[in-house]
Amino acid sequence: MKKYKTYQIVVIIIGLFLCFFGRFIPVSPKSMILRSAFTSRRYSGLSASGAQTLFIMVGGLLMWLLVGVDWTSLAVILALALIPELGMNKVAAGTLGNSTVFYLLLCFMLAKSLQATGVAHRLAVWFLTGSFSRKGAWCTIAMIFVSIFVLSSGLSSSSTIMIFLPILYEIFESLGYEKGKGDIFPAVMIASLAIICQIAQATTPISHAMTLIGFSSYNSYTGNNLEFGQYVMVAMPVGILTAIGWFLVCRYVWRPDVSRLSRLDYDAIKGNEGPFSKQEKIAATIYLIVVVLWLAPGISKYLCPPAYPLLNKIHQCYPPIVAIILLHFIKVDGKPVLPYKEAISAVPFSTLLFMGALLELGTALANGDIGVSTWLGDTIGVFCTGVSPFMFIVVLAAMSVILTNFMSNSVTCAICMAIAMPLSTSLYSGLISPVIAAIMITIGINFAFATAPATPPVAIAADSGWISAGRLFKYGAVAGLVGIAVMLAVGLPIANMVC
């Protein structure tokens, strides 16, 4: 049984009380919340169910942030089901029955094919040991960054970091570095592994739970879909330029001593890998076809408008379903390329349940009958009067990046969306497109680089023994500033063109 610290027990008690009994808390009229929730009458525009939804959000975020995302997700789901306007049937359909949750499940299963067949590891080694990488120390570092970026854009950042950690450890040891010595080069590389992973995670929704939460939160508030291709056209340039910016910071600001890389044995890293196996070719080909089908609808809207109506009928779940079935039935040497049981074993169901709970919470906040969205727009709008649309986007972008470095991506997304969506459809209606605000937030919440609580890859880097917490925070903070600058200088203009 998991043992909780004293503060966590206190948080659990407070969180559960807010989730289930928050509506009975008498609140001063000055706070614009219900004095009593024994009745369903409105007070200052907020219903009893609206007040309860806000308390569920506060209680849920507290438990998710300080306790964990396991059983707490079930508690939030139950609390939401007790709201009269929702009920268990709607809540169940909105959590595990959510198409975005199902899509993420399929992504994890499909991504397993790249890991199980060895494609992911081979790709990483190929980048690292190629002819360009051998031209010099900074060429090697550049190719390491490129390989991390490429893999993490299609795999979860946690999977990518687990592929590269053994490779980096092998490099450090072969060059004579030791843990705890405070050498800058290993520290820069370990920090960069987490940073590039997170940057790439922001570029596509493929196997990226937090990016998909941004997609679904936008849908919950507006009823519209954020297109795959539309998002990638904005996020990919931002990600690439942010990664390049970080590389330049590493080379010209941190300036680690890279002289030892001249002794790196590339052939030893490459090992005895033979040519591409038939399984690898099949898995890689099918995966690439799926990615093309995901991108086709959004891109065709701009490059080939006549084809858009047809391609737009391809739901994002269709390609991976077909791919997973094919990989199960296509056999090489009498064995499936990816057996179904092996594919399903790659699915982190606790993550899916957490994601479903968070999405349903967003749906409840946006529910017109409950009225929280309207109330938030009116309440927060008072503080935004006189703030220009551009400055509002600047604040959103900065807030999403800053908050996500001190709390989980999902909590940051919930907070930022709860502020941005109501205001972009009320105070800034016609001035700020909700989809642009959603894209900026979704990119920003992935730029979690500075602290261990921010995201699992950063926690792994912090616990590696190759970098101190202080240095990781400094590197992550600078990377965050680079990300904000690129989001506003490049991402925002592109978003205004394609959205």
Language-model-detected regions and their locations in the chain:
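Juxtamembrane helix-boundary/capping and inter-helix hinge elements in multi-pass membrane proteins
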Residues: 83-86, 116-120, 129-134, 171-186, ...
